[in-house]
């Protein structure tokens, strides 16, 4: 698992290690293994995928299943395009090539992103929607999707790419993500703190908890389906999320939010249309079900 100490990676790692049937796990990250993840079944490699020595360590043993989660976040990749390319594109291609040489056709689950779509219209969005990425991060994600599909076509990998929406609630301080306000809103109101929201109450986004994301990643590792899929998510307005927080923590929490919309942020992260994920739902992928369950899952993940 790459990015194994990250927000999603650490949650997935702990889930895998809690399952005695999941086998041995190798985690890779720039940092140390999460404190909650330990045991004889865990091997840890500290380093980056863009380091040739790290790739050589990974190549020492074959893998049956690989979760590729590591990436440079969108806003940083936009500010530092050379770093973004080295990690998000080149290192991903090198990883796939390494896994393809193992000759046992490993299953590869790749964490892609809704950033591949670019500017959105009011029409429902799904994998059938044309990918027109508007930022470097999204462009690199789309390139890696194509590379994984080509390895799958050639028969040396069994690849599935999942386009992830906004995942909540990232631990504080939330940085490097344009959608950071989604997590900050949940943390602030749950803690009884005042929060100035940079988008309007009517702004809509796609919301998915880390807990539900892990469920979907594990499913992707088990099923035979290959290709690119859009993960289901709840399409909720900020007002609906605030109402859910008020139901859980008390009606007075609604008054803690004030709004100071930033047009640039709302244009990119606050005008999401409906999702068309009928095919993904039929395969067993899922979202959190309701605003209240989303909040519960997000804050206990």
Task: Annotate each language-model stretch with its function.
Residues 49-87:
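NAD(P)H-binding glycine-rich loop region in Rossmannoid oxidoreductase-like domains
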Residues 119, 134-160:
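Active-site Tyr-X1-5-Lys
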Residues 76-91, 125-133:
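Short alpha-helical oligomerization interface
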Residues 149-203, 210:
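NAD(P)-dependent short-chain dehydrogenase/reductase
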Residues 274-282, 286-301:
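Amphipathic terminal alpha-helices
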Residues 1-19:
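N-terminal Rossmann NAD(P)H-binding glycine-rich loop of SDR-like oxidoreductase domains
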Residues 93-135:
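Conserved Rossmann-fold NAD(P)-dependent oxidoreductase catalytic core, especially the SDR/UDP-sugar
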Residues 198, 212, 216-270:
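Mid/C-terminal beta-alpha module of Rossmann-like enzyme folds, strongest
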């Amino acid at each position: 698992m790459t990015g194994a100490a990250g927000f999603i990676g650490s949650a997935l790692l702990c889930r895998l290690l809690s399952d005695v049937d999941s086998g041995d796990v190798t985690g890779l990250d720039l940092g140390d293994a999460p404190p909650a993840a330990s045991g004889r079944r865990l091997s840890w490699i500290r380093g980056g995928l863009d380091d040739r020595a790290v790739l050589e360590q990974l190549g020492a043993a074959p893998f049956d299943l690989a979760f590729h989660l590591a990436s440079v976040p969108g806003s940083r990749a936009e500010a530092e395009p050379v770093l973004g390319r080295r990690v998000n594109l080149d290192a991903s291609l090198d990883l796939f090539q390494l896994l393809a040489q193992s000759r046992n056709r490993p299953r590869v689950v790749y964490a892609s992103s809704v950033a591949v779509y670019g500017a959105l219209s009011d029409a429902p969005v799904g994998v059938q929607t044309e990918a027109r990425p508007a930022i470097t991060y999204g462009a690199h994600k789309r390139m890696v999707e194509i590379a994984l599909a080509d390895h799958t076509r050639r028969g040396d990998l069994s690849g599935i790419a999942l386009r992830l929406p906004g995942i909540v609630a990232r631990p504080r301080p939330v940085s490097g993500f344009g959608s950071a306000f989604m997590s900050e809103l949940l943390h602030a109101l749950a803690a009884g703190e005042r929060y100035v929201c940079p988008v309007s109450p009517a702004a809509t986004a796609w919301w998915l908890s880390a807990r539900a994301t892990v469920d979907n990643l594990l499913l992707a590792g088990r099923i035979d389906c290959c290709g690119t899929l859009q993960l289901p998510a709840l399409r909720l307005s900020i007002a609906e999320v605030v109402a859910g927080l008020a139901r859980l923590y008390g009606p007075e929490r609604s008054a803690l939010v004030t709004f100071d919309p930033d047009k640039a942020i709302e244009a990119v992260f606050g005008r999401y249309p409906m999702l068309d994920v009928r095919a993904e739902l039929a395969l067993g992928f899922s979202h959190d079900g309701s605003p209240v369950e989303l909040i519960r899952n997000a804050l206990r993940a």
